[in-house]
UniProtKB/Swiss-Prot annotation:
One of its GO terms (molecular function) is structural constituent of ribosome. The lineage of its organism: Bacteria, Pseudomonadati, Chlamydiota, Chlamydiia, Chlamydiales. Binds together with bS18 to 16S ribosomal RNA. One of its GO terms (biological process) is translation. It comes from Chlamydia pneumoniae (Chlamydophila pneumoniae). The keyword Ribosomal protein applies. Belongs to the bacterial ribosomal protein bS6 family. This is Small ribosomal subunit protein bS6. Keywords: Ribonucleoprotein, Ribosomal protein, RNA-binding, rRNA-binding.
Length: 112
């Protein structure tokens, strides 16, 4: 992998609610260590807690949401996605380029 300048990303991660608190922490640590192992830097982690999913994913109606702002080389993103696909505790993930790190996140609740 060539040395390219790191870019800022926002990663959204939804973990299974069947995980214990310790298992969820280990699953989150796995995501974080994946980023740092590729030379990335974590800027901010937002723990959004347990929330209702917009639709059922693998039988789950709820998930634990985390948003992580990090910088890493663009070439590392593909490798991270490969790792995410192998992580059975991770229901969904999305990675977007970010312009800045948001200090506060606010979301509207889903209708009942």
């Amino acid at each position: 992998m060539g040395k390219k300048e790191n870019q800022l990303y926002e990663g959204a991660y939804v973990f299974s609610v069947t995980l214990s608190e310790e298992a969820r922490r280990k699953a989150l640590d796995k995501v974080i260590s994946g980023i740092t192992n590729y030379g990335g830097e974590i800027h901010k982690i937002h723990d959004q807690g347990r929330k209702k999913l917009a639709y059922t994913i693998r039988g789950a109606r709820e998930g634990y949401y985390y948003f992580i702002y990090f910088s890493v080389s663009p070439g590392a993103i593909t490798e991270l996605w490969k790792e995410y696909h192998l992580n059975e505790d991770l229901l969904r993930f999305m990675t977007l380029r970010a312009d800045s790190v948001k200090e506060v996140l606010e979301f509207a609740s889903l209708p009942e």
